[in-house]
Amino acid sequence: FANESLAAQAKLLVPEVADWDLRIGGLHEALPEADVAIASSGTVTLECAWFRVPTVVLYKTSWITYLLGRLFVKVKHIAMPNVLAGREVFPEFIQRDANEVNLAREANRFLDDPGRRLELREELDVIADSLGGRGAAGRAAESVGRLLKN
């Protein structure tokens, strides 16, 4: 979690979270050890993919922002790894669907099925490799730009 407040909220909303090993900050130290992540859509989803962490993605915003986005932005996915793969690799939950029941269910599906985690990590190898070394951010931005133009 980014801060103690978010961790406390998660514990209140999802009772199962109280039993999980939660970390505050230190993302790059925590991700290599993580079995699963729940992340808000943004660059953190790409970091999760880079570290091969199965991730459940959520996106919540004001309804007006959401509706305007739906009108003007035509993409099938919101998580960068899904955009790069051209399909859903990380499960995504948007607006009302981004609720504690759906997020916990998907996170537990990853936790309960080591085979599913391994399969996903192999898919994430392909995504991470597509980012390459130096200049990767530029290549990722170009890929997204091409998708937005289409």
Where are these regions (language model features)?
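Nucleotide-activated sugar donor-binding and catalytic core shared by glycosyltransferases
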Residues: 1-150
